[in-house]
Amino acid sequence: MPEPATKRILSGVQPSGKLHLGNYFGAIRQHIALQEQGDAFYFIADYHALTTLKEAEAREADAAQKAGKTTWKSAREILAENVRDVALDYLALGLDPDRATFYRQSDVPEVTELTWILSTVTGMGLLERATSYKDKVSKGITPTVGLFTYPVLMAADILIVRSNLVPVGKDQVQHLEMTRDMAGYFNQAYDDVFPEPREMLGDAPTVPGTDGQKMSKSYGNTIEIFAEGKALKTAVMGVVTDSTPLEEPKNPETCNVFALYKLFATAGEAAQLAEQYRNPMLNADARKGRAFGYGDAKQLLLAKIDARFGPARERRKQLAADPVTVEDVLRAGARKARAEARKTLALVRQAVGMAAAPAE
């Protein structure tokens, strides 16, 4: 099958909780930019979320019980809330439904049909080599069939709309290689239906968490994108620093606060702050003669976060107050994605000798 004439970009985001700065600089910022560069498809991966939903419910119950509560959110409530949050977050941060196709994975049921068909040409050995499966099981995720066959569903997500470009992090390259393998298995067994998707490896920075490790929900060290007020200040002021005395020179290159500040600042602003680290008494008059400390740097970081995400927070509040509009966006995206999916499945069914799908 010939590849689309233009760039067809696809990426999914799993609804697994509040988005944080690591998500933004690692993926979301790139996704928003890519909607201007090709035919972009972005989906909320609620089918994928089912593989870890019970663990999410257990964490919710554990947190509630530790807080002395007797009720907590069910798995169903967690999934619905997380899907809604992803939709609100992406739209507030600049995803434009007039430029990109934005939809829920579960609103395109053709994906599950293609998943089954791909599974019939995919060897067990390929899936057994998936490092993400082993990693998740080692972290206590229940080893279900769904978790084991996760790469097949991911391949179906990509191939169902004949995407040829997929923005991924380095930890996801293996899944895309497996997608190419599955596309090749099908094309060789039946007919040349699928294009060969290629990875788009961005230069996403490693975002440090509040404890200095990579920012991740699993480490509990995140700064949420849409946190504000006291919650945001508490997170920023909790960023770990060393014990260098206030009046002593400090090394910006080993400081978590400086690393976070650089993500928001211009090169000139970062250079200024670095100089302030090295010369704590610089501009001391503005601080009533006091040396510059990590607390001052955290205040600068806090101001940068507010400046970057303040307008998006307001947009998110407006969208949250209008759930019908958000649902309309997702439904419209699903209609467009399903139109592409049906074209692909028609060719797949023809290739394997199945009858055409009944008209709806």
Could you tell me what each predicted segment is?
Residues 2-10, 15-156, 268, 307, ...:
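N-terminal Rossmann-like or analogous alpha/beta NTP/dinucleotide-binding catalytic cores
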Residues 15, 166-167, 221:
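A generic structural motif
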Residues 21-23, 63, 174, 180-360:
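Conserved nucleotide- and phosphate/pyrophosphate-binding catalytic cores
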Residues 73-76, 166-169, 247:
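Short, polar/flexible loop-turn hinges at active-site or ligand-entry regions and domain interfaces
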Residues 90, 171, 212:
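Conserved RecA-like P-loop NTPase ATPase core
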Residues 101-104, 167, 244:
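Short catalytic-loop micro-motif centered on adjacent basic/acidic residues
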Residues 135-182, 186, 190:
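Internal, conserved structured core segments that host functional sites
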